[in-house]
Amino acid sequence: MKTIKGPAVFLAQFVDKKAPFNSLEGMCKWAADLGYKGIQIPTWESFLIDLDKAAESQDYCDELIGKVGSYGLEITELSTHLQGQLVAVHPAYDLMFDNFAPDKLKKNPKGRTEWAIDTVKKAAVASRRLGLKAHATFSGALLWHTWHPWPQAPKGLVEMGFEELAKRWLPILDVFDENGVDVCYEIHPGEDLHDGITFERFLKATKNHKRVNILYDPSHFILQQLDYITYIDHYHEFIKS
């Protein structure tokens, strides 16, 4: 409990074309006025952060820290939920998830995946430059369509899926390790990491990579019929965000 500094808010859920939700300054003032102490910044919103610049320039990151700090706030994490989703997309969901990709990469699954991997790696460097120790993201999903037991999945399909998911994420995890930042996967419906067992399977597939951790958001757990209190008992050592 000694590490708790106060409430924080994920800005992505409130972004809008209208003020104050269309600028970093406006959103910082709004959050501070409501009593928040921290903000989680979605990296796909370029008016909130220039991720390319943040990965390259310490001066830019120092200015960003100062700007947020002037409102009495801290940056808690950067988020690559949308880009992380695109690290692994089953073809059945191509059309839906294409909306998360830049226009130039739409209808280009291979290019989209390569872009997503590169972008999440940049977030690792940017996180270090911002003095952050945790990063928020989604795992993506190659197996979500198999969660229901009918039709029966062929033997070995699930194992193959987690092996491929780990193969895509391991180079990213290594970059985060080089930068001293934990990757916190939000346990969420539609992701291959959607409960405790799937988290464990991914952890095993990555050979227990030390940067594989959990973003704990219990808001989905009741609908999934998961015990959100017992989950903490089982996985507290991995909950870093």
Feature-to-residue mapping (PLM):
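Residue-level marker of alpha-helix boundaries and capping positions
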Residues: 17-18, 54-55, 114, 162-163
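Acidic/polar N-terminal loop/beta-strand segments that form early-domain functional surfaces
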Residues: 12-14, 42-44, 80-81
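Conserved beta-strand positions in the central sheet of alpha/beta enzyme cores
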Residues: 40, 77-79, 136, 215, ...
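Active-site acidic/histidine proton-transfer and metal-coordination neighborhood
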Residues: 30, 70, 86-214, 223
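Short, glycine/acidic-enriched loop or turn micro-motifs at the edges of active sites
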Residues: 43, 189, 220
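Short acidic, glycine/proline-enriched helix-loop-strand junctions
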Residues: 49-74, 153-161, 181
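Histidine-acidic metal/acid-base catalytic patches
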Residues: 1-38, 59-70, 121, 125, ...
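Glycine-rich, proline-tolerant flexible connector loops at the mouths of alpha/beta enzymes
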Residues: 40-66, 84, 139-147
